[in-house]
Structures are given as C-alpha cells and as structure tokens.
C-alpha cells in the first residue's frame, strides 16, 4: 500500500470514528446534557467525621456543591471517624440499594470487601474517597478520589526534615493511627522518611475510634506527657487537620511558645491558618478535600447516567508553609480548602 493510500485510509477511518462519536452523543437523553441531569439518581455519601468536623466540613461542602450542580438525591452519613461505625453504616447503605455509594476507605480492604461484593451483585456503583482500598476496587470496581497515603506521608516527612533543619540524631514525635492498615499508611510513610534521614521518631498511636479527630482536646494529656518526657524534641507531626489546628493548645499545655517546636501535619482549616499566622504551625500537606466531596458524586452520576468508567484522581496538592499560606487562607476560612 502506498503512503498516499495509507493516508487516505487513515483519514477515512478518523472521519468515520468522528461521525460515530457524534451519532453516539446525539442519542444521549436530553437530561444528560442539561442542568440537573442526575436528578433521578440516589446516592449515599460518607462524610467521615461528625457534623462540623474541620476536615469533614470541607468534604461535605464539596459534596453539597456537586448535589446542587447535578441534582442527585444525596443522603449524608456522618461517622465520627469511627471505622466500626463506618462499616455498619455501609452495611445499611448497601441494604437500601441506592444508585451509588461514596464511601470513606478508612475501614480498609478486608472490612469493606464483603459489602463491596454485595453492592456489586446489586448493581450499586461505588466510589471511595480519602483512603484508598486497592484490593476492593481491583475485585469489584469503583474509583478513588484522594491523596495516595504512603506517597503523601513520605513526601511530608522529607519536607519536614528539610524545612525544620533537622539532622541525623535529632528527635521528633509523630502521631497517627499506625495500626490501621489502610489509613495509617500515610503516617507510617512520614515515620519511614524521617527514620531514613536518621531522625529518632517517637510514635504516638491515636485511638482507632477516631476520637482524637472528633475532639482534639482529648489528646492533650498524651501529647503533653510526650513533650515533658522528651524536652529535646525538635518537631511534632499530626495525623489530620483537626489536631494540627489545635497545636497552640498542645504547645501551651506543655509550656512551649510559638516557634519552639516545628509543628507539621496534613490539611488546611481556619484553625490551621491561624496557627500559621501565630507562628505555631510551620508545614502542612494539602489534599484538597473539597474535591474528595465533589468528584465522587460527579463520578457516580456519570457511571449511572452515562455509563462512564469510575474516576481515579490523586488530590495531593503539595505543601502549605508560612511563606504561602495566605494564598489559601481565605478559602480555608470558608471551608473550601
């Protein structure tokens, strides 16, 4: 076949494909192209924390915006970050047989697997946010919207080592749900990065019930004791925005002043912005929780109405520091970042 003929065939193939695509689009129901095109879809959405939770509120605001934009009927589920409660609520959600469920991945693959299997049998579309469940999605489908836990944790550890001016032999404290296979991967990654740089890391395990996230003041005695027993600690890492936003309280309870210790962690919030402003907080990793609310609902609507594949989006967005926090400050105060 000559080059000219090949070009002619290729051009004909492309034109045929374009014609077929246009024909396919023209057959979509009108509501798929208009506002509120997802109005006939019922979704159960897991917010994660309690109502008013610093992080969960941003997730919730993203989900509410998607609901307003697209029109589905959404039931919002609040779990106080309690993984056992999440599993029970997921069991109840599957029994209702909605069109789709957007589930927090905190309980992990093993706990979610049988319920994901039942959802698959019942034709319920699934999305997961904030914590990935790769074995579940490999077995029964579904997408994931959120940061990659270990990757983000390691990146934070490396950045903290650099910005805090740490060196081999220095001592740091890292708080986290280390025993949770899925959710704890992030903080384990931070610990690994610091240890590989030669830092001595004291690990403080947060309760599996998630109560420190629901009420950060409950951690005051543990953090205070750790700082008093280790007066040479140079840095402290926190597992989420709720605790990072409470840093002034922890430091003052231990008799420390702003800037005495390099405090770092994850997420943004109005409290964290104030922490930066007051010199209490030095570093946080942003994971754009608004997207973790908006995109799972968008993807479920696309799956149910348009037959599209589930979304997989890494929402890890880099770091916020004293040098750049003002860029996100106003949006953080509005619970949008």
Which functions belong to the PLM regions below?
Residues 5-6, 321:
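Helix N-cap / beta->alpha transition motif
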Residues 1-5, 28-34:
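Basic/polar N-terminal segments that are highly enriched at the extreme N-terminus
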Residues 31-337:
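A residue-level marker of the well-folded mature domains of exported/periplasmic proteins
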Residues 6-14:
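N-terminal export leaders
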Residues 13-26:
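Bacterial N-terminal signal peptides
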